Each structure stands twice: as structure tokens, then as C-alpha cells.
């Protein structure tokens, strides 16, 4: 046996598929219009007939498409079990696991978190499924069931995962594992949630979309324990080192943060004697880039600096570099330091200024959200004051 790729479902095919589902013409129009107008951009998730089916089920239960993706996924789990049962009165879905809907959802959230924590992708093997399940059971209350029955609930009943070949299982959409992993973090107490956010400050790779969901559903702790520490660290590590705004401080900071960044040039096969940019080198992962994109700002600056480097002659005379000397298909590499010394640091200085503005905006947003939440503690002090007066 072998797996064959299938084309993604397109919006032009929604109408025909809804007809196949038995959806009437009027309701079909309403559903397609709701999908199109949804502020949550739910249409980006609908790449398979099954995903469209689940969207229809949620729409029938809610009479609308939830406004945000977190709201959609929250409604989705409830809908595929209890709410769908009430809509289809003659149809009762059996919970193979024997768990209540709430306990099953908590276990699935832990399962999704452990899947990401283990570094697995969207598709996992049977042995990986069992291993993740065992870990998830350790962190989900009232989860007394076995792996096979849990899998039946998630694959056969909820359809949030699919059998993919003989010995593997795939999440219906990558956003499913990312959202429910975020929901698991939301359920954690303050100390454990803070440990999670601290760990992603050190290494955010693989957690980027989960963090975006947490920005919506756990905004207070997201900004308090993740954004504010990153902003403070970046102001110290980056902005403080270029406070004098000199070329030398900018060059040394650039080299320290992104030592592999530069520009690759290769010969332009369409124009004799011409060169073109083929790549910008490697970026060492920095968690702050997930929030501010400093690495991409600096690549844009390098692009502006080299916009007039068009010929082999100029490349060779300025940097003693010739595409014929390239050791791979990328071309010949010119380090960022050489470019900065040749053309000055004005463009990179602009990039750091943009970076500072982004940090300032993040700090303002974070302080506003955290401040509003902290202000709520005054409610209790006022109650106490009134009782003392009485």
C-alpha cells in the first residue's frame, strides 16, 4: 500500500459537496456566505470534505460561524459530541472511552500538548500515539481509559484525527493540535503556566501557532509571562548595545545576533556579466523573532543595501568575490559586516529603529492588558473597606 496525495478542497467546490451532504439550497447559501464573511478566516481551514462537514455541524449548532478561531475550536469539540446528538435526535454517539465529554476534552488537550512537546508533526505512528497517550493520562484528571478506546472516540466519533495508512494517525488540521495544546496551557495553574512560557522564551520553535492562540485565550499570562520578559530582555540585549548609534556598535551587534547572515550572489544566466541575489544566509533562531521579526527586518535592510550590486565587476572590485568561486548552488557569500563597511549602516539603523518601535508597541499593549487585570484586585479591597465602614 502507499499513500497518494489528494487535491485540497476549494471554495468553488463547497456548493456541490454541501448538496451531497443533503444541505438544502437556501441553507447552503447561508453556510457559504457565513464562511466567506467569517472574521476568523475559517475558509483557510477548510481543505478537506471532512473539515467542511465539521464546519457545517458547528454552524447548525450555533446558527453562525464563531468569530474567532479559538471560539470555533472550542465549539467544535462540544458540537461533535453532545450538540450534534441533540440535533440528530435519532442518532446517539457512543463514547468508547467511557469518559464524560469534559474529561475526554481535557485528555485530548493534554494529548495535543504532549504531541507538540515530543516534537511530533501532524502525523504520528501507532507507537507514538500510545506513548503520547500515556504521558497525557499523567496530566489529565479523571482519564481512566485505555489508548484504543480513546483513539476510537477521537478518530471514529469526533473525527479530529484520521487513520493514515496502516500504522499512523493524522490530525485533521494542524490548527487542531495547536489550539487544543493552547487550551491545555490555559487549564494550568499559574506556576506551571509560567514554566511553560519561560521555556518558550528560550525556544519557541514548534510553539509559534500555539502561542498565537494563547494570545487570545490566555492573554493576561501570555503578556505577563511571555511578552514582557522578552521585551525587557531584547531592550537590554539589543537596543542597549546600539545606544550610541555608531556604525561599529551596529556592526558588532549585527554579527553577535546573526553571525551567519549575509548575501549570496550568483551569476544571472539571462544577462551576461550580471549577478543577482540568491539568498541571505542562515538565521540562528531567536524567540524574539516570533514577536518582532528582527531577522527579517535585517534581511530587508541587506536587500536595500545591495539593490545596486548588479555586475560581476562591481561584486569583484568591492568584495573580491566572484560567483565562479562559489562552493554550492547558492553562489558566493558576502558577509553582512563587509556589506556594512562598504555601504554604511544607514539601512540597518532604520531596521533597528523599526524594531524598537515594535518593542515599544508590544510593551504598551502588554502593560495595558496586565494593568487592567491587576486593577481587578481593587474590587476586593473596596469590598473590605465597605465592610469595615459598616
Q: For the regions a protein language model found, what residue spans apply to each?
A:
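Leucine-enriched alpha-helical scaffold segments used for protein-protein interaction
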Residues: 5, 29-36, 135-171, 175-390
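Extended hydrophobic
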Residues: 1, 8-169, 174-176, 184-187, ...
Amino acid at each position: 500500500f502507499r499513500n497518494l496525495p489528494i487535491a485540497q478542497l476549494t471554495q468553488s467546490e463547497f456548493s456541490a459537496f454541501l448538496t451531497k451532504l443533503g444541505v438544502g439550497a437556501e441553507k447552503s447559501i447561508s453556510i457559504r456566505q457565513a464562511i466567506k464573511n467569517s472574521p476568523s478566516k475559517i475558509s483557510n481551514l477548510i481543505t478537506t470534505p471532512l473539515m467542511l462537514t465539521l464546519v457545517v455541524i458547528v454552524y447548525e449548532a450555533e446558527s453562525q460561524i464563531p468569530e474567532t478561531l479559538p471560539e470555533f475550536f472550542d465549539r467544535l469539540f462540544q458540537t461533535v459530541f453532545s450538540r450534534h446528538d441533540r440535533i440528530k435526535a435519532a442518532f446517539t454517539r457512543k463514547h468508547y472511552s467511557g469518559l464524560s465529554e469534559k474529561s475526554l476534552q481535557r485528555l485530548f488537550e493534554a494529548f495535543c500538548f504532549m504531541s507538540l512537546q515530543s516534537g511530533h508533526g501532524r502525523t504520528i505512528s501507532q507507537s507514538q500515539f500510545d506513548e503520547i497517550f500515556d504521558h497525557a493520562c499523567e496530566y489529565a484528571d479523571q482519564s481512566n481509559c485505555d489508548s484504543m478506546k480513546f483513539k476510537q472516540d477521537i478518530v471514529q466519533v469526533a473525527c479530529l484525527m484520521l487513520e493514515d495508512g496502516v500504522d499512523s494517525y493524522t490530525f485533521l488540521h494542524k490548527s487542531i493540535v495547536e489550539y487544543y495544546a493552547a487550551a491545555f496551557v490555559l487549564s494550568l495553574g499559574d506556576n506551571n503556566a509560567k514554566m511553560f512560557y519561560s521555556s518558550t522564551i528560550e525556544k519557541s520553535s514548534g510553539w509559534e501557532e500555539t502561542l498565537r492562540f494563547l494570545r487570545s485565550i490566555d492573554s493576561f499570562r501570555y503578556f505577563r509571562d511571555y511578552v514582557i520578559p522578552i521585551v525587557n530582555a531584547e531592550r537590554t540585549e539589543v537596543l542597549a548595545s546600539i545606544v550610541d548609534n555608531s556604525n561599529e556598535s551596529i556592526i558588532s551587534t549585527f554579527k553577535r545576533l546573526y553571525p551567519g547572515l549575509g548575501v549570496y550572489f550568483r551569476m544571472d544566466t539571462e544577462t551576461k556579466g550580471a549577478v543577482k541575489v540568491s539568498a541571505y544566509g542562515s538565521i540562528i533562531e531567536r524567540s524574539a523573532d516570533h514577536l518582532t521579526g528582527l531577522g527579517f527586518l535585517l534581511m530587508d535592510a541587506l536587500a536595500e543595501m545591495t539593490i545596486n550590486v548588479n555586475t560581476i565587476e562591481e561584486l569583484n572590485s568591492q568584495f573580491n568575490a566572484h560567483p565562479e568561486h562559489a562552493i554550492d548552488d547558492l553562489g558566493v557569500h558576502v558577509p553582512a559586516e563587509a556589506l556594512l563597511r562598504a555601504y554604511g549602516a544607514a539601512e540597518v539603523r532604520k531596521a533597528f529603529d523599526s524594531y524598537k518601535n515594535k518593542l515599544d508597541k508590544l510593551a504598551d499593549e502588554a502593560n495595558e492588558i496586565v494593568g487592567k487585570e491587576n486593577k481587578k484586585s481593587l474590587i476586593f479591597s473596596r469590598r473590605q473597606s465597605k465592610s469595615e465602614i459598616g
